């Protein structure tokens, strides 16, 4: 159930180039039961920046009432968020959207989790949930270069983990699909989050597989009211049928929406 709450900053640190790990605490965490959902953060008091910033939920610790977000500080809003210190309060709205269907993976099956860039974080909570129910997980994490690689060791604690960098400075040179080809990776179910180009490549390969993708789109309200994040359905690509990423998604079955 969505709630609005002022949450306390437990810790914030830069873990890779311009990539920040922010831990917040509050009872809102008790509502975070679906990996792949996101929160809307009011990065500062006042009216500038005006819009809240959508950030995916990376890790949930309901015993401590804490959750972790990872984000890239690149625009005015996220750069402001990166200045927030331990003990400060941050206005949080969430959890929002529909996440990854953990129930679609069965114990004993193999799940392939593919993340690209800042699309990697929500896969961490998902991976933990899958492992807890007896699913074997394989992770492929794609980044531009070594300086922006994060959470490789944390994912490796949960299952086989491969990294690809576009420039070849770490792991496999190239894209996540190169890792799949190089290692002949097979799986029963696919979960993915990342850039549209990556999601399109996966969709082209795995239309017949059980697969779910999380879309990264710029969102305004986060609750389906402003229509800033609509996408067409593949069954009606030029018509009036659409889905809203923020409220109908951000997770969709592969092949449902136009990428």
Curated annotation (Swiss-Prot):
Cofactor, free-text remark: Binds 1 [2Fe-2S] cluster per subunit. Binds 1 FAD per subunit.
Q: List the cofactors.
A: [2Fe-2S] cluster; FAD
Q: Which CDD domains match?
A: DHOD_e_trans (cd06218)
Coiled-coil region(s): none
Q: Which Pfam families match?
A: DHODB_Fe-S_bind (PF10418), FAD_binding_6 (PF00970), NAD_binding_1 (PF00175)
Question: Is Ribonucleoprotein one of the keywords?
Answer: no
Quote the pathway field.
Pyrimidine metabolism; UMP biosynthesis via de novo pathway; orotate from (S)-dihydroorotate (NAD(+) route): step 1/1
Sorted alphabetically, which keywords does the UniProt record give? 2Fe-2S, Electron transport, FAD, Flavoprotein, Iron, Iron-sulfur, Metal-binding, Pyrimidine biosynthesis, Transport
Q: Which family does it belong to?
A: Belongs to the PyrK family.
Quaternary structure per UniProt? Heterotetramer of 2 PyrK and 2 PyrD type B subunits.
Q: What does this protein do?
A: Responsible for channeling the electrons from the oxidation of dihydroorotate from the FMN redox center in the PyrD type B subunit to the ultimate electron acceptor NAD(+).
Give the protein's recorded name: Dihydroorotate dehydrogenase B (NAD(+)), electron transfer subunit
């Amino acid at each position: 159930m969505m709630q609005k709450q002022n949450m306390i900053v437990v810790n914030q640190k830069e873990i890779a180039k311009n990539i920040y790990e922010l831990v917040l605490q509050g009872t809102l965490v008790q509502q975070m039961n679906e990996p792949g959902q996101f929160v809307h953060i009011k990065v500062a008091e006042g009216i500038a920046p005006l819009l809240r910033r959508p950030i995916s939920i990376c890790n949930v610790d309901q015993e401590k009432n804490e959750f972790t977000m990872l984000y890239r500080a690149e625009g005015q809003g996220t750069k402001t968020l990166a200045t927030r210190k331990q003990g400060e309060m941050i206005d949080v709205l969430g959890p929002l959207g529909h996440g990854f269907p953990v129930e679609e993976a069965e114990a004993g099956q193999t799940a392939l989790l593919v993340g690209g860039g800042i699309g990697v974080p929500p896969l961490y909570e998902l991976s933990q949930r899958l492992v807890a129910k007896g699913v074997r997980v394989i992770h492929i994490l794609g980044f531009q270069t070594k300086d922006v690689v994060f959470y490789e060791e944390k994912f490796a604690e949960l299952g086989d983990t491969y990294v690809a960098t576009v420039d070849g400075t770490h792991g496999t040179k190239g894209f996540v699909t190169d890792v799949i080809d190089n290692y002949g990776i097979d799986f029963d179910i696919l979960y993915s989050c990342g850039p549209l180009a990556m999601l399109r490549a996966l969709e082209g390969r795995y239309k017949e597989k059980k697969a779910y993708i999380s879309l990264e789109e710029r969102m305004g309200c986060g609750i389906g009211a402003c229509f800033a994040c609509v996408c067409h359905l593949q069954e009606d690509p030029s018509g009036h049928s659409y889905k809203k990423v923020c409220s109908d998604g951000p997770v969709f079955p592969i092949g449902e929406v136009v990428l």
